[in-house]
């Protein structure tokens, strides 16, 4: 992790709607990796998807904008977001097991 974390941010997201069974997690992984973001995404038992994402603020905004749409089969009804300082604990973006 030799790069400086200054300027990097963390966003914790909860994505609601028709977001499970529509390849949302894998599509999010592909999009986050394309953008150079790190973190994880997983399904929640209540039908939502949650993600923790770290990266440069402008790139995070691009990913969050994508989350409001999701893949073609998804129907996103809302995205809740909490911002914080990045920890640098992630080296890539992964799909995690359901919480």
UniProtKB/Swiss-Prot annotation:
<dbReference type="InterPro" id="IPR020456">
    <property type="entry name" value="Acylphosphatase"/>
</dbReference>
<feature type="compositionally biased region" description="Polar residues">
    <location>
        <begin position="89"/>
        <end position="99"/>
    </location>
</feature>
<dbReference type="Pfam" id="PF00708">
    <property type="entry name" value="Acylphosphatase"/>
</dbReference>
<feature type="domain" description="Acylphosphatase-like">
    <location>
        <begin position="10"/>
        <end position="97"/>
    </location>
</feature>
<feature type="active site">
    <location>
        <position position="25"/>
    </location>
</feature>
<protein>
    <recommendedName>
        <fullName>Acylphosphatase</fullName>
        <ecNumber>3.6.1.7</ecNumber>
    </recommendedName>
</protein>
<comment type="similarity">
    <text>Belongs to the acylphosphatase family.</text>
</comment>
<dbReference type="GO" id="GO:0003998">
    <property type="term" value="F:acylphosphatase activity"/>
</dbReference>
<dbReference type="InterPro" id="IPR001792">
    <property type="entry name" value="Acylphosphatase-like_dom"/>
</dbReference>
<keyword id="KW-0378">Hydrolase</keyword>
<feature type="region of interest" description="Disordered">
    <location>
        <begin position="75"/>
        <end position="99"/>
    </location>
</feature>
<dbReference type="InterPro" id="IPR036046">
    <property type="entry name" value="Acylphosphatase-like_dom_sf"/>
</dbReference>
<feature type="active site">
    <location>
        <position position="43"/>
    </location>
</feature>
<dbReference type="InterPro" id="IPR017968">
    <property type="entry name" value="Acylphosphatase_CS"/>
</dbReference>
């Amino acid at each position: 992790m030799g790069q400086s974390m200054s300027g990097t941010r963390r966003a914790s997201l909860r994505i609601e709607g028709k977001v499970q069974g529509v390849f949302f997690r894998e599509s999010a992984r592909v999009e986050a990796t394309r953008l150079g973001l790190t973190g994880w995404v997983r399904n929640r038992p209540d039908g939502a998807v949650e993600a923790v994402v770290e990266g440069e603020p402008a790139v995070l905004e691009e990913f969050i904008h994508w989350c409001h749409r999701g893949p073609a089969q998804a129907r996103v009804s809302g995205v809740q977001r909490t911002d914080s300082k990045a920890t640098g604990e992630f080296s890539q973006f992964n799909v995690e097991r359901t919480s």
